[in-house]
Amino acid sequence: MFKLIVLFLMICAIPFFSEELTHKSITVRTTYYNPVSSQCSGNPLITADGSKISLQKLKNGELKWVAISRDLLKQFPHGSKIKVVSKKHPEINGVYEIHDTMGPKHTYSIDILAHQSKGHLFGAHLVSIRKVK
């Protein structure tokens, strides 16, 4: 009887353990934004955490920054690095730093900071993200 109780408790605990393991990688909607006043509130060259966007570095591909939806901010706070994996657009795969926050209407989303000449190339799609240490 004791073995059955232990087995039952182990089976009941599986969802909790697997959720704990899989929360490291989640699927989110990704879009792209440019540092222009029509797409940002306040100064478009200053992110929510106070970081300054260098347009030259952005154009050269040296800045790999994202904005994250507010519901994910606790799990992925400003300054965190995330690995982005896209099956549809593998060219965007890589490690990005979180420096900005999306508007309140967005959930389970990231917004990749892109130079005006590049962001429109991909459109909205789903990606997998996980925190990088």
Q: Which residues are covered by each model-predicted region?
A:
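Short hydrophobic alpha-helical membrane-anchoring segments
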Residues: 12-20
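Sec-dependent N-terminal signal peptides
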Residues: 4-12
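Solvent-exposed, well-ordered loop and adjacent helix/strand elements within mature globular domains
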Residues: 19-133
